A protein has these predicted regions:
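Outer membrane beta-barrel translocator domains of Type V secretion systems
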Residues: 1-141, 258-262, 266-282
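Short secondary-structure transition/capping segments
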Residues: 97-111, 147, 235-252
Length: 282
């Protein structure tokens, strides 16, 4: 989500605190899970050429996952990104990408007969994200509207998994997975002046479509054998809704405080996030 949530708007530096929580429903093959993420993102962007801007960002987030049945995972995530836009009158073209390094720790309990094991693993992984987007401004005296189309590609690769703890420990070689999603939607914002403070309200409603296979597959094997088998995740939903809402408060000519909510809702997954940020223009 990070790559498609950033775009260059004004000359300045910005900081954003974020929190995210999600739920995935299980099926006959895999149990559901709960996730939570918190962290901070920092960025700097400015004008590069006429009606064009470029920005860089970095940040740290930590994700926790509870899979039930005494299984959990934690991931420390380090982000680096580049993004920008170019305007042609009312038409805006945006693009960007991020690269994330993960340090993942997993733990699960295995109970069979009189045996009880606690299997643990620590491994590294990487995620690359790219997005392109176009939007068209429709402005009147009351509200600004922007229909938009967004296409995002995500590629994930782990550096191998090697559990330890008992006879049921698993291992896996380096593996990668990819996903592509498009979003069609409408953004709206309006603003007014309250005494010496400028206030803006913004919202977004979109339809997101996932391409390709909906299940993510990992090939694993028991540590003492070479017989591999596939483990499938809970499938993502083919289609879902994207919701966003926020408020920006310009406390002076240089500083803007923001508070926002984002949600992705589908039949199998519910994902919610809140963020608070500050932009300092120069």
């Amino acid at each position: 989500r990070i790559a498609s949530d950033i775009k260059a708007d004004d000359n300045g530096a910005w900081a954003k605190l974020l929190g995210n929580w999600g739920h995935a429903s299980g099926n006959d093959n895999a149990t559901g899970y709960q996730t939570s993420t918190y962290g901070v993102l920092l960025g700097l962007d400015g004008e590069l050429f006429d009606d064009g801007r470029l920005g860089v960002m970095t940040g740290y987030t930590r994700t926790s996952l509870d899979g039930g049945y005494q299984s959990d995972a934690h991931s420390d995530n380090y982000h680096l990104g580049l993004y920008g836009n170019k305007r042609f009158g009312a038409l805006a073209l945006r693009a960007g990408g991020t690269y994330t390094w993960h340090r993942i720790d997993t733990s699960r309990s295995v109970n069979y007969g009189a045996q009880s094991d606690r299997e643990k693993a620590s491994y590294n992984a990487r995620t690359g994200q790219l997005f392109i987007e176009s939007g068209y401004d429709w402005t009147n005296d009351t509200v600004n509207l922007e229909p938009f189309a967004n296409l995002a590609y995500t590629h994930y690769r782990n550096e191998g998994i090697n559990e330890h703890g008992g006879a049921a420990a698993l291992r896996g070689d380096k593996q990668s997975q990819s996903a592509t999603a498009s979003t069609l939607g409408l953004r709206a914002d309006t603003q007014w002046q309250a005494d010496s403070v400028a206030i803006a309200l913004r919202g977004e409603l979109g339809w997101q479509h996932q391409y390709g296979k909906l299940e993510r597959k990992t090939q694993l094997m028991f540590k003492r054998t070479d017989a591999a088998f596939d483990v499938n995740s809970v499938p993502v939903s083919r289609d879902g809704a994207v919701l966003k809402a926020g408020v920006d408060v310009a406390v002076n000519k240089n500083a803007v405080l923001s508070l926002g909510y984002g949600g992705q809702l589908s039949s199998n997954h519910q994902d919610n996030s809140v963020n608070a940020g500050m932009t300092w223009r120069f």
